[in-house]
Structure formats: structure tokens, C-alpha cells
């Protein structure tokens, strides 16, 4: 089992650092899946137990000038590593304006993801800064729980408003309640609502786009004004919004009535899917 990769392009390095920062805000620990063409950052707190799920995917050729890996076997040419997200984010922050970044799977008394950063001083001399990130190599029997989540057939799909504005609204609502209702319809309307014994507050967003859904979708027979809604933990929504440091190319919210909300984001050439289950 081997893995080594190198980034020399500064724009690619900064983009990879932004992705790592986002993951650190979304998940304390995550699984890094390494395959010949892709890297995935995965969080799979079982939906049945009330946890969120995340699937972040990037094509390795869009980031790395060199990329070599050998999985556990020819038939299973993949590697699954569990790591603390903040450790990777912290290591990459030292790489800003560096000449090159190398990532390698190593064993230094314990399994590590070793990040080597080549820094250049004002006198043009270079020095290497090395970070050894502790990891846990996951055995094959655990892989089945870490596959790409199947996308549920949603009742309503709607494009999100500006995420910074949405975050500002949700932050204010958190001071009133720890639960929130997110609801939307096929007329481009999205509401964020909190209800307590003393107060009911709703923020309305209108004239949003509804992406086209497959012709066999359950939403095809739905009245355009009917709201699909889901009752969620406001902290989980806020954590998702706080993780978005870059304006996405695409941001879609898919609601499965009273079951789950699925956020589908495209950040340049990185895709992010994030699932928040309904409160029971």
C-alpha cells in the first residue's frame, strides 16, 4: 500500500488548502479515500442515529502534478484513512506561497500522512517543513459503510440564496431556538422558520430557481405551491454554512419531506454533498 503526491502550482495549492479548511469546519474527524483518479473526504455519522453525512470529491489531476498510489490489492485499488481534519488543515496552512507540497503515506512508529512543505526565504534559500499527521488505516470490512451515498428521490429541489446571507439569518435564529424548519416549493420559494411557545419567526426567499428533476421524480405530481419541509437541528445547518468559505458555482437544496435535507454544492471543480436528517 503506497501513496505519494505533489502540488507545485500555487493556485492548485491554495484551492486544496481551502477545501481542507472547509472539511475541518464540517467534520472533526473524516475518512480520506484515495483512488487512482479521485480523492474523497467522507463523513458518515449514521443517519439513523441522527448524524450528518458528507461526501466531498475532487479529481486528483486538477490538483496534483505527481500522483502515485497502490491500494490494498489490484482488485481493490483504494486506500481508506481516518484522520483528524484539523491536523491536515493546519499543516496545509503553512504551505501558502510555498514552492512545493508533498504528501506521502509513511510509517514512523505509527501510520502517518506526512506533509512536506518547501518554503522559500527572502534570500531565496529554501527549507523543508514536515508535518506527520497520525492516521488510522481502515480495513476492507469497514469500506462498505463509506461508499458514496445514494441520492434520495426528493420532493422539492431548489437553488439556495447567497450562503453568506443565509448564514447571517440562521445565526440570528439560533439565539431564539435550537431547532429550525426549512421548507421550499416548486415556485422558487424557500422559508427558514423557527417556532417556540413565545414567538414564530420566518425568513422568506423568493424567485429562486428550481432545477429540473427527472420525469419519474415524485415531485412531478406535486402542486407548485405545496411546501416540502424538514425539521432539523439548527447547529448542524449552521456548521454546514460556516464551512463555506468560497462562493459555490452551484448550490442546491433537495428536501425529502419530513426525512432529510440534502445540500449539493459545486466549488469550482470540487463537489460537496451534505445530508442533515430530520429531527425525530
UniProtKB/Swiss-Prot annotation:
UniProt tissue specificity: Ubiquitous.
Location of the protein in the cell: Nucleus; Cytoplasm, Cytosol
Example GO biological process: response to UV
UniProt xrefs under SUPFAM superfamilies: DNA clamp (SSF55979)
A Pfam family matched in the record: Hus1
Keyword Metal-binding among record annotations: no
Keywords from the UniProt entry: Cytoplasm, DNA damage, Nucleus
Recorded GO CC terms: checkpoint clamp complex; cytosol; nucleolus; nucleus
Chief location of this protein within or outside the cell: nucleus
PANTHER family with a match to the protein in the record: CHECKPOINT PROTEIN HUS1 (PTHR12900:SF4), MITOTIC AND DNA DAMAGE CHECKPOINT PROTEIN HUS1 (PTHR12900)
Subunit structure: Component of the toroidal 9-1-1 (RAD9-RAD1-HUS1) complex, composed of RAD9A, RAD1 and HUS1. The 9-1-1 complex associates with LIG1, POLB, FEN1, RAD17, HDAC1, RPA1 and RPA2. The 9-1-1 complex associates with the RAD17-RFC complex. HUS1 interacts with POLB, HDAC1, FEN1, PCNA and RAD9B. HUS1 does not interact with RAD17. Interacts with DNAJC7.
Protein's job: Component of the 9-1-1 cell-cycle checkpoint response complex that plays a major role in DNA repair. The 9-1-1 complex is recruited to DNA lesion upon damage by the RAD17-replication factor C (RFC) clamp loader complex. Acts then as a sliding clamp platform on DNA for several proteins involved in long-patch base excision repair (LP-BER).
Family: Belongs to the HUS1 family.
Protein's name in the database: Checkpoint protein HUS1
Gene: Hus1
Amino acid at each position: 500500500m503506497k501513496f505519494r503526491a505533489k502540488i507545485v502550482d500555487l493556485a492548485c495549492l491554495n484551492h486544496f488548502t481551502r477545501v481542507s479548511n472547509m472539511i475541518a469546519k464540517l467534520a472533526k474527524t473524516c475518512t480520506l479515500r484515495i483512488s487512482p483518479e479521485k480523492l474523497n473526504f467522507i463523513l458518515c455519522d449514521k443517519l439513523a442515529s441522527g448524524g450528518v453525512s458528507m461526501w466531498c470529491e475532487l479529481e486528483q489531476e486538477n490538483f496534483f502534478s505527481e500522483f502515485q498510489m497502490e491500494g490494498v490489492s489490484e482488485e481493490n485499488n483504494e486506500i481508506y484513512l481516518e484522520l483528524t481534519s484539523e491536523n491536515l488543515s493546519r499543516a496545509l496552512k503553512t504551505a501558502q506561497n510555498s514552492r512545493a507540497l508533498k504528501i506521502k503515506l509513511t510509517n514512523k512508529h505509527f501510520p502517518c500522512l506526512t506533509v512536506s512543505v518547501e518554503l522559500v526565504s527572502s534570500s531565496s534559500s529554501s527549507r523543508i517543513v514536515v508535518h506527520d499527521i497520525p492516521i488510522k488505516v481502515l480495513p476492507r470490512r469497514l469500506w462498505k459503510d463509506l461508499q458514496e451515498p445514494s441520492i434520495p428521490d426528493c420532493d422539492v429541489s431548489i437553488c439556495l440564496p447567497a450562503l453568506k446571507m443565509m448564514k447571517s439569518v440562521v445565526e440570528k435564529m439560533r439565539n431564539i431556538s435550537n431547532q429550525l424548519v426549512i421548507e421550499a416549493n416548486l415556485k422558487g420559494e424557500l422559508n427558514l422558520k423557527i417556532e417556540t411557545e413565545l414567538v414564530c419567526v420566518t425568513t422568506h426567499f423568493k424567485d429562486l430557481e428550481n432545477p429540473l428533476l427527472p420525469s419519474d421524480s415524485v415531485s412531478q405530481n406535486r402542486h407548485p405551491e405545496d411546501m416540502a419541509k424538514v425539521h432539523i437541528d439548527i447547529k448542524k445547518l449552521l456548521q454546514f454554512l460556516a464551512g463555506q468559505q468560497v462562493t459555490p458555482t452551484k448550490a442546491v437544496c433537495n428536501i425529502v419531506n419530513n426525512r432529510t435535507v440534502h445540500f449539493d454544492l459545486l466549488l469550482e471543480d470540487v463537489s460537496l454533498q451534505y445530508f442533515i436528517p430530520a429531527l425525530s
